[in-house]
């Protein structure tokens, strides 16, 4: 049993596991070297051998407790035939689908997305059994926002989406994407993932009612379906920006773990631990600091608050490309050598 699975089961409270979102990526020189051997980001994602190598790079360097497969939430719409482009300093961007009704006609192109599962299989065979392998997907709502032409620069605006698309059409589209998402996660589990994480990056823009319909309901459906087939698999949800709705999400989706963004106060995370394992929430900007004391104080504060219960140390969002490697090394050392003052 991996150390992270032990954390879910509360069977090893003397050890806090650690991994970082986007831990395999641009801040690593070894990643930069490998990236130069491919023509595009997605070419790297769809090369099983190279994607597996990238996935394992941060494990070799930092001894993280989990590997997360090197991929992207947009491989799913890409495999449906929606044109995805990688734009420098912006990342993967989907070409806006002309009409959401067209989404119903699209079929998965297995030749593309199956490469992700091949990479997972390679990683699982090379990865120490004490390490977990995390598969992931985008939440159906978040994937839908990209299909509608939004991205990290042109951020989704709920009222704009609502005025341009009928509520029933949005729900139908989310239902279609939910089915594809379940298939995608099932295939990752069959390939060797023992944990999956659902990244709902744009959950936080939704009002209460739509949050329930567009985020909680499909996530609950995903969790229920996966648990029926794979009861041993752990599922982490990440409804970024959900604020007070983190509690509603955790209770109603039945996720095993809840990943928290850096805007959620630690005392709220402490409350969430009553219903699930919590993960997070160090601000990625904090670890850009040249002052090691600032980093140390932030890490210790999180550990003091959360490490006595079900907890995985992580960031509140993905690691930034300009992050100094020495700062990551410091955090790993602090977490692994931490001893509670209680």
Swiss-Prot record:
Q: Which GO terms describe its molecular function?
A: uroporphyrinogen decarboxylase activity
Could you tell me what reaction this enzyme catalyses? uroporphyrinogen III + 4 H(+) = coproporphyrinogen III + 4 CO2
UniProt pathway = Porphyrin-containing compound metabolism; protoporphyrin-IX biosynthesis; coproporphyrinogen-III from 5-aminolevulinate: step 4/4
Extract the Pfam families matched here: URO-D (PF01208)
In short, the EC number is 4.1.1.37
Keyword check for Lyase, yes or no. Answer: yes
Q: Which GO annotations describe the biological process of this protein?
A: protoporphyrinogen IX biosynthetic process
Q: Where is this site: Transition state stabilizer?
A: 72
Q: Which family does it belong to?
A: Belongs to the uroporphyrinogen decarboxylase family.
The subunit field of the Swiss-Prot or TrEMBL record says:
Homodimer.
PANTHER family tied to this protein: METHYLTETRAHYDROFOLATE:HOMOCYSTEINE METHYLTRANSFERASE RELATED, UROPORPHYRINOGEN DECARBOXYLASE
What's this protein's name?
Answer: Uroporphyrinogen decarboxylase
Species of origin: Orientia tsutsugamushi (strain Ikeda) (Rickettsia tsutsugamushi)
């Amino acid at each position: 049993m991996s150390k992270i699975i032990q954390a879910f089961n509360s069977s090893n409270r003397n050890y806090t596991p650690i991994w970082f979102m986007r831990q395999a990526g641009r801040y690593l020189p070894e990643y930069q070297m490998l990236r130069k051997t491919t023509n595009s980001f997605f070419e790297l994602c769809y090369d099983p051998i190279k994607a597996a190598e990238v996935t394992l790079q941060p494990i070799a360097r930092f001894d993280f407790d989990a590997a997360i497969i090197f991929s992207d939430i947009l491989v799913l719409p890409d495999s449906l035939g929606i044109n995805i482009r990688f734009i420098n300093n912006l990342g993967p961007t989907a070409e806006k689908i002309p009409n959401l009704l067209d989404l119903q006609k699209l079929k998965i192109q297995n030749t593309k997305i199956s490469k992700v599962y091949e990479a997972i299989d390679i990683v699982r065979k090379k990865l120490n059994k004490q390490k977990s392998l995390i598969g992931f997907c985008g939440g159906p709502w978040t994937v839908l926002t990209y299909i509608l032409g939004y991205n990290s620069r042109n951020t989704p605006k709920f009222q704009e989406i609502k005025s341009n698309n009928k509520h029933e059409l949005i729900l139908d589209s989310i239902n279609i994407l939910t089915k594809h998402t379940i298939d995608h996660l099932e295939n990752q589990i069959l390939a060797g993932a023992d944990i999956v994480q659902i990244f709902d990056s744009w959950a936080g823009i939704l009002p209460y009612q739509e949050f329930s319909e567009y985020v909680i309901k499909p996530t609950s459906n995903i969790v229920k379906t996966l648990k029926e087939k794979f009861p041993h698999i752990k599922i982490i949800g990440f409804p970024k920006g959900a604020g007070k709705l983190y509690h509603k999400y955790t209770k109603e989706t039945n996720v095993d773990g809840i990943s928290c963004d850096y805007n959620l106060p630690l005392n709220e995370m402490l409350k969430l631990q009553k219903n699930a394992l919590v993960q997070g929430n160090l601000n990625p900007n904090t670890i850009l600091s040249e002052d090691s004391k600032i980093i140390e104080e932030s890490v210790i504060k999180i550990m003091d608050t959360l490490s006595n219960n079900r907890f995985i140390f992580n960031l509140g969002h993905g690691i930034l490309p300009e992050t100094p490697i020495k700062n990551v090394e410091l955090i790993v050392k602090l977490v692994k050598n931490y001893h509670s003052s209680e």
